[in-house]
Amino acid sequence: MTKALEGIRVLDMTHVQSGPSATQLLAWLGADVVKLEAPTGDITRGQLRDLPDVDSLYFTMLNCNKRSITLNTKTERGKEILTELIRRSDVMVENFGPGAVDRMGFTWDRIRDINPRIVYASIKGFGDGPYTDFKAYEVVAQAMGGSMSTTGFEDGPPLATGAQIGDSGTGIHAVAGILAALYQRENTGRGQRVNVAMQHAVLNLCRVKLRDQQRLAHGPLAEYPNDDFGDEVPRSGNASGGGQPGWAVKCAPGGPNDYVYVIVQPVGWKPLSELIGRPELADDPEWATPEARLPQLTKMFQLIEEWSATLPKWEVLEKLNAHNIPCGPILSTKEIVEDASLVANEMVVTVPHPERGEFVTVGSPLKLSDSPVDVTSSPLLGEHNAEVYVGELGLGDEELRLLKSNGVI
């Protein structure tokens, strides 16, 4: 069976997370992703190692289904080889610091002269302006994209989210831009530049908070449990801030992740009041309608928690779902790795590795009926040098040996 992106060749000049997450997704969709690394390798190969002298999980979990070649692009011969790789590629992706690829001698004008059909994607921290040259990391993007100021509790400091919305979130946005550019190329015959900034991607994921910033001009946000409102959207703990109020309520026996997130819809109030042993609240004018409950959300969830705290979260989940009440248990990372349904859906997969033996990673969240994903191991450093340089670029075995001895690869 062919893959969705079969025949698309991606020159992957990315490192760390924002770029590799994008190119891994392209590889899962069937593209031939050739990861170009300096002879010393992507820095994450050696970061946060759990085992000595093997590629770290940080690297392996972001670089599955790729091939790896090494190249010193600072050498003249390295630049010549890079030129040929660009000429043969459909997509080029990089996430170096601003201007780094230009300083190599490969401006966008030169790249499109080499290959007018190439889609050239760049991931940076920020767009054009005063922040352009700032260094960006995951939490920096969260800080400057609206996430941290709105995450946490009202009386606490700004908090980072555990989800990598600045890195992997940006990678997903980059993939959308790349696919759109490839599709447009079918009509125009030419490639184009795709620019994605981490700050912009985080902001896109925080759009509901900008919605609420504008709503503040008309008064307090009733859907928030906060006592006070200024002229900025406040942090509101676990409140959804949407039309259907929600909160994480404690469950037995009281461990750090013994919680269930419960959403109270209008239709769910009657069965919920019966479940918690307060059936009279279904008809009580002070509780019966969403409008009546809105000013006392904190008290409402306290009543629910008095019930949920006596039961394990899986029993709470079962009872709530029996009445079609939206809810979800807070799953720890250990529970996620062991979740049978996630394994069955190939979202948690075990991958063989030539040096590690095997490792557990996240599978593709995109399920295409005609392009199934088989997650394969990340490549060893330079594993495909001979395959690409000799087999595809036509270099001789002796030249390959000289390139290695001269530090070009």
Curated annotation (Swiss-Prot):
Pathway recorded for this protein: Metabolic intermediate degradation; oxalate degradation; CO(2) and formate from oxalate: step 1/2
Gene Ontology MF terms: formyl-CoA transferase activity
Positions with a binding annotation for CoA: Q17, S18, L71, N72, T73, K74, N95, F96, G97, R103, K135, A136, Y137, E138
Intrachain disulfide bonds: none
Alphabetic keyword roster: Transferase
Positions with a binding annotation for substrate: G242, G243, Q244
Catalytic activity reported: formyl-CoA + oxalate = oxalyl-CoA + formate
Catalytic residue positions: D167
Subunit structure: Homodimer.
PANTHER family: SUCCINATE--HYDROXYMETHYLGLUTARATE COA-TRANSFERASE
Function in brief: Involved in the catabolism of oxalate and in the adapatation to low pH via the induction of the oxalate-dependent acid tolerance response (ATR). Catalyzes the transfer of the CoA moiety from formyl-CoA to oxalate.
Family, per entry: Belongs to the CoA-transferase III family. Frc subfamily.
HAMAP family xrefs: Formyl_CoA_transfer
Protein name: Formyl-CoA:oxalate CoA-transferase
Gene source species: Streptomyces avermitilis (strain ATCC 31267 / DSM 46492 / JCM 5070 / NBRC 14893 / NCIMB 12804 / NRRL 8165 / MA-4680)
